[in-house]
């Protein structure tokens, strides 16, 4: 995340600093952790995981709290992880306009 500070002035009254409020501008959108970004990210992420779980295990609730890193071992959450990475690849492809196969061919 790139952060560019347009104007920062301290408010603690130390010598050489103004008592004006600090102003910071972010170059690339609102960073996670500020105001509503983090809850919105967490909610949307879990909705995608639950959507993937519904496709793997229809009519059942997915109780895995963590998904494994890729290619570690097989357990019930691994199928959900594979489905989730497939959705992630589709979104990346839709946003970039470049096919994943084209990207893999270049690598």
UniProtKB/Swiss-Prot annotation:
Keywords: Mitochondrion. Transmembrane segments: none annotated. The keyword Mitochondrion applies. Pfam families: Mitovir_RNA_pol. It is found in: Mitochondrion. GO terms for cellular component: mitochondrion. Its main location: mitochondrion. Disulfide bonds: none annotated. The keyword RNA-binding does not apply. It comes from the Eukaryota. A stretch of 270 kb of the mitochondrial genome is duplicated within the centromere of chromosome 2 resulting in the duplication of the gene. The expression of the duplicated gene is not demonstrated. This is Uncharacterized mitochondrial protein AtMg00490. It comes from Arabidopsis thaliana.
